[in-house]
């Protein structure tokens, strides 16, 4: 609203995608384009308010995704901090998504694609003509420079273990325009195998390895927690059902309080050894329960189709 009390036109939603070079920003932006967002990659930051004003006046329902890259941010490291409150007034929904990955993985990606890191090969601060950055040094320098932006992010995704398709699905799940999500929060419920490592972006991690393991029943070994014989096996002693009853009470208590704190996303991972039987069963059941409670739920099984493992 301006000084005369006139409502300022607003863009429906603005998703700013920032993060480390090689972490998947282009993949994330393409995913947003696929679900209906107007994709603007690396515009001059200072031009964003004017651009948002034009878009808000030209259409009633404007969903915009903007890529923020090191090249643009490096010219004025404090620009985003100054612009964020201005853009907040101009958009009904402003989200800053930050993508990162382990340094060794980023170096590997640059080597495989033969792309040049925006900071590689340049003189290091205080160095002479010989003090040129390696790719690894460039990655670490960028991580340091982008830290103020990361600190302001609504959501951080670590793409170390994410294939491009997995990242596309994750972004689409997060920002898909869903008119039926009246609760204001999206719940991600994911199964995984601890032997393959944990996700770094989970809000809560639960361990299902206390349940009897269907792996040791040869008739069930090649099946998954989505198959009826495995579900019957896990239902047999009542432990899984009792655990789910406790989870229903826990989330019935927690989620309304997270909504009150304006938390838009909550991710819970449930793991077992291989991510094939117990965690898959529990995640499917928990997803059903949370959906029946009126929440938007996204279920993902990270390791279900890996080779059978204990």
From Swiss-Prot:
Native organism: Magnetococcus marinus (strain ATCC BAA-1437 / JCM 17883 / MC-1)
GO molecular function, one term: ATP binding
Pfam annotation, one family: PapZ_C
Name of the featured protein: Nucleotide-binding protein Mmc1_3333
Statement: the UniProt record of this protein carries the keyword GTP-binding: yes
Lineage summary: Bacteria, Pseudomonadati, Pseudomonadota, Alphaproteobacteria, Magnetococcales
Family of this protein: Belongs to the RapZ-like family.
Annotated function: Displays ATPase and GTPase activities.
Residues that hold ATP according to the record: 19-26
CDD domains in the record: NK
Domain of life: Bacteria
Keywords: ATP-binding, GTP-binding, Nucleotide-binding
InterPro entries noted in UniProt: P-loop_NTPase (IPR027417), RapZ-like (IPR005337), RapZ-like_N (IPR053930), RapZ_C (IPR053931)
PANTHER family: RNASE ADAPTER PROTEIN RAPZ
């Amino acid at each position: 609203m301006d000084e005369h009390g006139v409502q300022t036109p607003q863009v429906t939603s603005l998703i700013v995608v920032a993060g480390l070079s090689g972490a998947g920003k282009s993949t994330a932006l393409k995913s947003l384009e696929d679900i209906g967002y107007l994709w603007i990659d690396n515009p001059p930051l200072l031009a964003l308010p004017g651009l948002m004003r034009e878009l808000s006046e030209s259409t009633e329902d404007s969903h915009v995704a903007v890529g923020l890259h090191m090249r643009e941010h490096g010219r004025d490291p404090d620009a985003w901090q100054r612009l964020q409150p201005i853009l907040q007034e101009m958009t009904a929904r402003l989200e800053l998504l930050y993508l990162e990955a382990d340094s060794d993985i980023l170096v590997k990606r640059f080597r495989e694609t033969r792309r040049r890191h925006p900071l590689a090969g340049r003189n290091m601060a205080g160095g002479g003509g010989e003090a040129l950055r390696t790719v690894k040094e460039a990655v670490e320098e960028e991580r340091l420079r982008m830290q103020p932006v990361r600190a302001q992010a609504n959501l951080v995704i670590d793409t170390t273990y994410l294939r491009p398709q997995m990242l596309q699905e994750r972004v689409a799940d997060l920002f898909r325009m869903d008119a039926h999500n009246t609760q204001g929060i999206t719940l991600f419920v994911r199964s995984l195998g601890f032997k393959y490592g944990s996700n770094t972006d989970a809000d809560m991690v639960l361990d299902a390895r206390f349940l009897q393991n269907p792996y040791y029943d040869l008739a069930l070994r090649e099946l998954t927690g989505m198959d009826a014989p495995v579900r019957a096996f896990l239902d047999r002693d009542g432990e899984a059902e009792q655990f789910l009853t406790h989870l229903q009470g826990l989330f019935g208590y927690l989620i309304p309080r997270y909504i009150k704190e304006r938390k838009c996303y909550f991710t819970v991972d449930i793991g077992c050894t291989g991510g094939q039987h117990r965690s898959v069963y529990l995640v499917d059941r928990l997803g059903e329960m949370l959906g029946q409670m009126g929440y938007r739920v996204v279920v993902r099984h990270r390791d279900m189709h890996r080779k059978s493992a204990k």
